[in-house]
Amino acid sequence: MAGMAAALAKERAAAAGAGRHGQAVPYLGQDFGALRRECLQGGRLFHDPSFPAGPAALGYRELGPNSYKTKGVVWCRPTELCSCPRFIAGGATRTDICQGALGDCWLLAAIASLTLNEEILARVVPRDQSFQDEYAGIFHFQFWQYGEWVDVVVDDRLPTKNGELLFVHSAEGSEFWSALLEKAYAKLNGSYEALSGGTTTEGFEDFTGGIAEWYELQKAPPNLFKIIQKALQKGSLLGCSIDITSAAETEAVTSQKLVKGHAYSVTGAEEVNFRGSIQKLIRIRNPWGEVEWTGKWNDNCPNWSGVDPEVRERLTRRHEDGEFWMAFNDFLRHYSRLEICNLTPDTLASDRYKKWSLLKLDGNWRRGATAGGCRNYPNTFWTNPQYLIKLEEEDEDPDDPEGGCTFLIGLIQKHRRKQRKMGEDMHTIGFAIYEVPPEFSGQTNIHLSKNFFLTNKAREKSNTFINLREVLNRFKLPAGEYIIVPSTFEPNLNGDFCLRVFSEKNANSTVIDDEIEANFEETEIDEDDIEPSFKKLFGQLAGSDAEISAFELRSILNKILAKRQDIKSDGFSIETCKIMVDLLDNDGSGKLGLKEFHTLWTKIQKYQKIYREIDVDRSGTMNSYEMRRALEAAGFKLSCQLHQIIVARFADEDLIIDFDNCVRCLIRLETLYKMFRKLDTEKTGTIELNLINWLFFTVI
């Protein structure tokens, strides 16, 4: 219940603008400005209570309290490590980013790429902080996390051994922005050790909010040059590198002056007419400018004399230091990997870029309710969350005779790094895309059933199911309606996710979910309509007051239930019996009269019939997926979120729902629905309650 309230509050805050980059959400409620003022006024340095400088911040296994790697660690402030510490001195460069005793080279590569773009760097590393002006031992950094920007505060106590920083450090030793950035990112993920192992694209995304894709250049798709051109037109960040096979090859220079294991950026892609044939050229930038390519199409290559003078002048006149052209074929031959970080529209201030259209959807998988696993599990696959996307406009690409809509889908699983210390790790995740058949076109209130997926083949799917934070693929499909089904590979795994769709043209999306409905039979009867035999039975059961209390009801029902061999149950609980009395006690006596007991008896017989019919394996019990069908048979259509709540509330640890819990669930739903319908006299779907009424209803 508390989690639902928190999620609703977060949703409302986001609608008001919280989480956009200009309104980053204070992580763990820590406000940088207020905390710094408080420290300055009190004449003290900040100590972060939410990420204390101690063993837990380092890690849980290899960097745990009993590890030899953490013995002798001392937490020091930069002012204790050198006489004149600087936050950033002379601009952020690669020499500020030297790896320490932590396997987070993926993160450092992303930070290095960040230094290539001052505008984006300034978003992650705010410049309103230093070791001189208003220094209070507190710093802050901003990261994108699953759809929102968060502002993470840290104190400047850093782990050291023998007087030197244990993790990221600058080569020169007196610059600390990169070490503090790493600490803030470690706090966000629970510990330093949680940062071990990852992909550069993960860092790219958390520093920009973009969606990152990568290509192995030895397996480049035939349209990669066109992809690069479009990415540059959209202001994307492009990086490339040459793989190394050993640490000794780091920064090794090839015979044609390319540096291995070094982050380059891609800044241009052009087609030129060279002596009657079209040549594809790509412009690369070595951000530190020491060495440049000496192969074909370098600055001094005679090939340029075979190009139209105006084109040559346009392509070569505004070189930045360290920037060079090379043939695209040479690029594919010499480089190993290309990474493209496609930026969100709000990141790009300039109007000269053709911006992506962005859709973001949050969801979750919950064991027994909405964690159906992949297509290999047809009995449960259909229970996964389903999302409708409408691709309404085709790309504006005159060179493409086929047409279609280009879009990227990225499925990110949330918070998995943080859960490593609890023995959790990344799930294996993926997704499938289905074309909406004509009979379902335009409908968003019908969660597609098992039969649909048994009779319809996926139009597209993720290239693989993989245990990384994100699985991402690029697609091109005709305009139309499609359903995306994200899932874990195996069923019944809990997790939260963020699904993003970047499309060249505007697209719309929505969650596909059943509209909440309740259709149960309400038959008014008079006492005269009740059979004499039932009246006689009631008289024997009710006693002298001619009414049945919840305690008497429990005794009666359990005697009857004990005789049933086809339903396994420990009997009705007193709580269930009280709920049944509450539903049917029209006169407020707290007991059931003849008519009320007759109505209840009819309901229980109906529930028994449903329970037996749904229990196809004749186990005498019902699992959580069968419960979904039982609810429909009883007249209820519920959303996926409600199914999650029902499983959490009424199923046991083996996802079994016995007859008592089945009845309690159905009675509670009927009671709540009737109360709402009574108060919603205008049938608007909304009611207004004050606190006392809210409390009255929620204690039922």
From Swiss-Prot:
Ca(2+) 6 binds at D585, D587, S589, K591, E596. Ca(2+) 7 binds at D615, D617, S619, T621, E626. Pfam families: Calpain_III, EF-hand_8, Peptidase_C2. Residues 345-514 are annotated as: Domain III. Ca(2+) 1 binds at D658, N661. SUPFAM superfamilies: Calpain large subunit, middle domain (domain III), Cysteine proteinases, EF-hand. Residues 572-605, 602-637, 667-700 form the EF-hand domain. It is found in: Cytoplasm; Cell membrane. Residues 45-344 form the Calpain catalytic domain. One of its GO terms (molecular function) is protein tyrosine kinase binding. GO terms for biological process: cellular response to amino acid stimulus; proteolysis. Residues 515-529 are annotated as: Linker. Ca(2+) 3 binds at G91, D96, E175. This is Calpain-2 catalytic subunit. It comes from Gallus gallus (Chicken). The lineage of its organism: Eukaryota, Metazoa, Chordata, Craniata, Vertebrata. The gene is CAPN2.
